[in-house]
Amino acid sequence: MSDPSCSACSGTWPDSNHFIADLGLSMAYLHDDQFFPGWTVVVFKRHATELFHLAPTERIQMMEEVSRFANMLAETFDARKMNYGLLGNQVPHIHWHLIPRLSNDPAPLEPVWCVPHDPVTLSEEAIQATIA
């Protein structure tokens, strides 16, 4: 199932240049804003807006994919904590934000959405180096 009005289904979000990996039921992309290094978005391939729209087996597999990828991010970025976000208010399509929180985190007790900052956009070379 696909929704042509959905930016995730139509391929306009996330940026395909930020593709990291096909995880099975989902795909991982480096988030556009790297103020929090390693911020990744794991996007469910099929259109669904709520976890309860998924079959139980899909929910289990999706959580396994998110968990495995979060573990890899935590190890790669030496995260002291991982943050997980599943909101869907701006992009109504199931996608998880995986945000490594590092030892030099500018606001370790705050949700990332509450930290005022200028977005950090990486060059194409830096994107490729990060996702390699």
Question: How would you label these PLM feature ranges?
Answer:
Residues 1-132:
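HIT superfamily nucleotide-processing domains
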